[in-house]
Amino acid sequence: MLRWLTAGESHGPALVGIIEGVPAGVELTSSQIADALARRRLGYGRGARMKFEQDVVTVLGGVRHGITQGGPVAIQVGNTEWPKWEQIMAADPVAPEILADQARNAPLTRPRPGHADFTGMQKYGFDEARPVLERASARETATRVALGTVASQFLKQLGIELVSHTVSIASVSVPEGRPLPVPANVIALDADPLRCFDRETSDAMVAEVDAAHKEGETLGGVVEVLAYGLPPGLGSYVHWDRRLDSRLAAALMGIQAIKGVEVGDGFLTASRRGSAAHDEIVKDSDGRIIRTSNRAGGIEGGMSIGDVLRVRAAMKPIATVPRALKTIDVSTGEAAKAHHQRSDVCAVPAAGVVAEAMVALVLAEAVAEKFGGDSVAETARNIKGYLDNIPASLDSIGQ
């Protein structure tokens, strides 16, 4: 069983993540995790924090000489800004007279619409939003990307690779029918300002971000994660919570600012006739069973089908709007403008990297659940044995 947990606050000393159930033999280094975190900071339209934020990675346990040992893997992502926040975010009590001189310690009593601020204050009984936003912040996703790197490395050694890309920013979208990126395209994707695989569309996206910046606005968009090399049969149809698409949807909806998820052609299929919505099963010229298309996105009946997995997540515009939205100052009860701090105009490219990490974690869990193995070599043998024993009459090949 693979499970994971994160802890820490946005301006605390560090974020910490633990992932358990990773087999021995996964090749993993601090630099690989750092590279993944650097990808999370990419993207045109990011705020000032990305310019000086450096993720200091420390692997605390579970790895020796670049190889996982079979125990829980613990990763710390240090906060280089901690000295500025040491007294304000200290775990132990700090004298009131010391805090009184700290401008950063001013109570945040004007909750931001679209954030967890107001409801979090209601739920936990806080009189200001600082305790809420510190944990609710998307900064926490740095830990998920770190843990997702562990999962990705595990999957990669089994021949399963992931790639994410941006398919829309606001109303600017990649035209239907354009080629999908493959793992070999990751470097080129990361070099694109918005991690878009279509150059012409990327240029239009940049213009959209520039226009929003001038108007004091923020933008959302849609990202897509693709997984190549999956065997058929991950997930199950027997219970709702074991369905692979259900688990992927939950994981992606758990990312800050994600408001919608679709697998394959998703919502588009709702407007089609049944004969144009599904993937017919035929034999190719070599007699192998194939599907004529991949509208299902690589999942049928809650199970992977051995084709490319394709899942999308829709991100709303960032709620910290420079123009500042209307709110109520809870300390006075009067109308006010919401608290504003540095923020991004568009963080959709980063959302793609986070989504990729979450998909990796779900798939790694599904692989471990289906095939087991205390070592990567054992897992690989189990997968081979499973595939070798699929009856010839049911043998298929991905699109």
UniProtKB/Swiss-Prot annotation:
Q: How is the cofactor bound?
A: Reduced FMN (FMNH(2)).
Q: Which GO terms describe its cellular component?
A: cytosol
Which pathway, metabolic or otherwise, does it act in? Metabolic intermediate biosynthesis; chorismate biosynthesis; chorismate from D-erythrose 4-phosphate and phosphoenolpyruvate: step 7/7
Kindly give the CDD domains that the UniProt entry links to this protein: Chorismate_synthase
Listed SUPFAM superfamilies: Chorismate synthase, AroC (SSF103263)
This enzyme's EC code(s): 4.2.3.5
Catalysed conversion reaction: 5-O-(1-carboxyvinyl)-3-phosphoshikimate = chorismate + phosphate
One MF term in GO for this entry?
Answer: chorismate synthase activity
Q: Which cofactor does it need?
A: FMNH2
Binding of FMN: at which residues? 135-137, 256-257, 301, 316-320, 342
Q: Where does NADP(+) bind?
A: 40, 46
Q: Name one Pfam family in it.
A: Chorismate_synt
Alphabetized UniProt keyword annotations:
Amino-acid biosynthesis, Aromatic amino acid biosynthesis, FAD, Flavoprotein, FMN, Lyase, NADP
Family annotation (InterPro entries): Chorismate_synth, Chorismate_synth_AroC_sf, Chorismate_synthase_CS
The biological processes this protein is annotated with in GO are: amino acid biosynthetic process; aromatic amino acid family biosynthetic process; chorismate biosynthetic process
The record's family statement is: Belongs to the chorismate synthase family.
Q: How does it assemble?
A: Homotetramer.
Name the job this protein performs: This reaction introduces a second double bond into the aromatic ring system.
Q: What name does the UniProt record give this protein?
A: Chorismate synthase
Annotated source species:
Arthrobacter sp. (strain FB24)
